[in-house]
Amino acid sequence: MDKLLRVENLNKDKILHKVSFEMEQGEMLAIMGPSGSGKSTLLYNVSGMDQPTGGKVWLGDTEITGLSEDAKADLRLHRMGFIFQQMNMIANLNILDNILLPVMQANKGKGGKSKSELIAEAKRRMRQLSISELGSRQITQVSGGQLQRACICRSIMNEPEILFADEPPGALNKSAAGEVVAELLKLNQEGMSILIVTHDSKVASTCDRIIYLLDGDIRGELGLGKLENSMEKQREERVNRWLMDMGW
């Protein structure tokens, strides 16, 4: 498999210390660790939303850390998708307009798809995520799980090479969280590469591989391979045993 993401000796002030790892095309990789271990900081620095104080990051053949801020913003808009626990929806826009916002910006002045084509694409993806009836609603008129599925829809509208997810089901109840994880797993099974920060062993057990971060250092790694439904319980038990060995 091709290396999609390469991180080499990444430093960030006193938070990250020469962090190095690689991610393959089509992989679902979890970053775990206790609060304050540097998980979210790692995600922000790898994706170019923050500038590390040392080290390099590549997405494919593009060195992200060597780009200007404008070039990094353009790369995030066209080649990355993002899902955050806080969801980052615009309060005065309805669900459909929120979903369309980034991809409309990405298509502006580039001779890409028309607005009607993008709306049709958004509605198709909304049907896939079981939120087709929510397009005209305001963000205050839907449940947390529905809103997070709308965030997933928004994040994949530009057909990104990689999806970054920072505790996506963290603020949801158990049922809604399970639905969100199932949607992410479905995307991965369709070929989407996903880097997910999580403190939840059940979420991590659906991933192909887990990296354990402590005090800004990678302290361990667990390879699980692709999930088979019949092995779900055994995988979670294996992850929990490994986390105990890591000092979780």
What residues fall within each predicted segment?
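Short coil-to-helix segment of the ABC ATPase nucleotide-binding domain corresponding to the Q-loop/switch region
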Residues: 93-102
